[in-house]
UniProtKB/Swiss-Prot annotation:
The protein's annotated pathway: Phospholipid metabolism; CDP-diacylglycerol biosynthesis; CDP-diacylglycerol from sn-glycerol 3-phosphate: step 1/3
Chief subcellular location: membrane
The species this protein was found in: Shewanella putrefaciens (strain CN-32 / ATCC BAA-453)
Bilayer topology annotation: Peripheral membrane protein
GO BP term, example: CDP-diacylglycerol biosynthetic process
Compartments in which it is found: Cell inner membrane
SMART domains: PlsC
Designated name of the protein: Glycerol-3-phosphate acyltransferase
Class of this enzyme: transferase
Family: Belongs to the GPAT/DAPAT family.
Organism ancestry: Bacteria, Pseudomonadati, Pseudomonadota, Gammaproteobacteria, Alteromonadales
Any GO molecular function: glycerol-3-phosphate O-acyltransferase activity
Amino acid sequence: MPKQDSLWLKSLRWIQKHLVHTIVVPQDPFADLNLDTSRPLAYVMKTESLSDIAALSEVTEKLGLPSPYEPLVVNGVVAPRVVCLQGRKPLFGERAGNEPFLECFMRLLAVHKERPELDIQLVPVSLYWGRTPGKEDDTMKAAVLERENPTWLRKCFMILFLGRHNFVQFSNAVSLRYMADEHGTDMGIAHKLARVARVHFRRQRKVMTGPLLPNRQALFDSLLKSESLRKAIQEEAVSKKISETQARETAIEYLDEIAANYSDSLVRIAERFLTWLWNKLYSGINIKGAEHIRQLHHDGHEIVYVPCHRSHMDYLLLSYILYYQGMVPPHIAAGINLNFWPAGPLFRRGGAFFIRRSFNGNKLYTAVFREYLDQLFAKGYSVEYFSEGGRSRTGRLLAPKTGMIAMTMNSVLRGIERPVTLVPVYLGYDHVMEVATYHKELSGKKKQKESVWQVFGAIRKLGNFGQGYVNFGEPITLQTFLNEMAPNWRAELADDPEQKPTWLTPAVNVLANRVMTRINDAAAASSVTLTSLALLASEQNALERCLLERQLDLYLTLLKRVPYTSFTSVAEGDGKHLVQQGINLNKFSVSSDPLGEIVSIDANQAISMTYYRNNIIHLFIIPSLIASCLTHNEQSQRQQIVAIVNDFYPLLKAELFMGIKDIPSYVNQVLDLFIEQGLITESDNLSVVTEHSSQLVLLSGSVSETLQRYAIIFNLLAHRPKMERSELESESHLLAQRLGALHGITAPEFYDKKLYGTLSVKLKELGYLSDKDDKSDVKRIRDQANSLLRASVRQTIVASVTAEHIS
C-alpha cells in the first residue's frame, strides 16, 4: 500500500474530497457496536482498493479511530492496519489470491499465542459506491456501475457517477483472542476466518442493496403462470360468464394497479430531497433499536415492518431512516387513495404497492394481491404495512385490521422457508401537520380526498416541527409464534395443505394485538408529549412554570427508574429543558405576573394537544391510577391498590394495548419510587406527604377521564344487569356526551363509539356482560370507580343512570 503522504494518495484524496460524500453506518459505531478504543484494532475488507481505503481514512479521522494507513504494531510485529480478503482486480487478467490475507492472519494469531493478555479487535468494513441492487435482466448500466468486484477503470466510473452515494459500514468486532483460545492458531483457523468473512460480506451486501430487481412485465408473466392465479382466472371466467382471456386481462389490470415499480435512481434522488426536507422540518430524528433489525436482515430473516400510522409523513420517514441505517427501503402497502398523479407514480417507483380499502368479496383481486405478496416474500423484499388501516385521528392506536397480517401468516403456512419476522415500529412527532384536519373530521367534517392540491397546501405549512422519533419494537418471528399457538401446525398442513385450520383466525387476532402492544412498548416520551400530559391534567390547562418543571422531573424519573419496557425511549434533559423545548415549538404559551411565569395551553389548542398526550398515555396510566388511589384515600394499603389496578387492568390493556406482565411487581416498584421521592410515607399504611400532594394530584389527573368512562359503564351494568352489548355501547356513548357537556370534557376519544365497542367486547370476554345473577364483581368495580371520581362527576353519572330516560 502506498504511504499516506505519497503524492499519489494525496492526489486521490483530493479528488475524493470533491467527488465523494460518505455516509457512515451505523452513525455511532462506538455506541452501536461496542468498539473498545483501549484495545488494538484492525480493519477487514473484502477487496483491496485504494479508493475504498481513502474513503475509510476520511471516516476514521472524523470518528477518532486508527487510520487505515497506520501499521498495526503489536509486540514488535508490524502488520497492515487493513487486511483484505482478495487483491485488486487488474484491468486484464486475474486478481491476486488470498495468500497475503492468510499470512497476515497467521502473524496476528501467532502474536496472540505468545501474549495471553493480547486481544486484537477485527472490525469488518464494507464500502458501497451507490446501492444499486442490479436487475434480473442485467443492463449496460449494470455492467458499468453495478458489479460487485470492479476493475480500477470501472471503479473510476463508479466514483464519478455514484461518489455522492458512498456508504461505509462497520460491523461488530471479532475478538482474535476468542478465536485463538477457542479454535487454535494454525492455518486451518485462518482459512476458516476467510470463509466466515466472505459469507459475512456477501450477506452484508444483500442487506445494504437488497435482492435483484425484477423486470415488471416478466414478474407479471411469472405470477400469471402460478397455479393459484390460473385457478382464480378460470373461476372468474366461469362466475362472470366471460372468456379466460378476458379474465386474464382483468388480472393483468389488477396487477398493474397493485404492483410497485421500484427504481433505485428515484430512491437516490428522493434521498437528496428528503435530506433537505428533514433538515428544514426537524431539528433531529431520534432512532432506537435499528442495530437489532439490521442483524435480523443479516441473519436472513424476511422482514415485515408494521408501524403505527400518525401521518402521511410515515411513508417517507421510515423508508428514509432504513436507507440511512444501511437497510433497503421496504415495499410499502399504500391505500389506493394515494394513487393520484403525480404522487402515485412517484410512490410506486419508491416501492409502494397499492391496496384497496376493501376487497368486497372480489376473489380474483384477492388472489392477485395474495400472489403478489407471496412473490415479494419469496424474492426477499422487505415489506411494510400499517395494521391500523388508516391514520389515527386521536393519537391512540386504532384497533388493528387483520387482513394483511392474515395474508402474511398464510404465506408462512404455504411454505416460506426463511424466518418471517414482524417488526413493530413506533413513529412519533413533536408536530403532526394533519392534527387540525383530524379534529375537523372528528367533529363531523367530511374527509377530503387526497389530491395534488393537498400536497401543495401541506408544503405551504412546512415549518419548525421539532423532532421525529423512530423506535423499533420487539420483533415477532411468525414461525416461532405459530409454534407457540399451534405446536403441530406443520404436521397439520402436511396432512391437508388446503385446509383452513380452526386455530388460524384466533391466532391472527392474538398476533395483531401483540403487534399493537409491542408498538406501544416502544413509545417515545418527548418534550411535547410529556408537557401535554402534565398540562392537560391540570384544571385550567395551566401551571406555574416551576411546578410544571418539577412535575416533568418526576415523570422523567418514573420512566427511567421504573421503565415501561426496555424498548421505550425517554427525552434527554430535565424538566426545565423539556418546557423550554415545547415553548420554542410554539406549542405552549407563557405569561408572567409578579409571582412568576405561567405555562399554559391556549383554549383553541387544547383539543389538538390531546393528540400528543394520547401518544404516551399508556406509559403513565397505571402510575396515574395508583396516584388516584393514594389521593382519594387518607390511608391505603399496597394490597388494596394492587387489587384495584388488577380489576381495571384488563380494560386498560384492551383500550391502550398494554403489555405489563407482572402487575403486582410493577405497582410495588412505582410505590417504592413514590416513597423514595418523598411523595408518600409507609408504616402500616401508605399516606400522602402533604407538601408534595399536588404532584400526585396532578399525576392522578391523567387517568380521570378513563375512570369516568369505566364508571359510566359499570354503573349502567350494575343498574341494568341484563343489558345487551349494543344497548351498553349506545347508552354509554349517550351518557358520555352528557357528562362531557356538563363538565367540559373535550378529548375526542371520550366520545369515540368504537372505543365503547372495544370495551364492551372485553367486558363480555371477562364475564361482566352475562346472564349470571351474581353481579358482585360488577358492583365492586363500580364502587371502586365511583370512589376515585370527583364528587360532582360521580353525582352526574349516578343521577343520569338512575334517571327515567336512561333506565
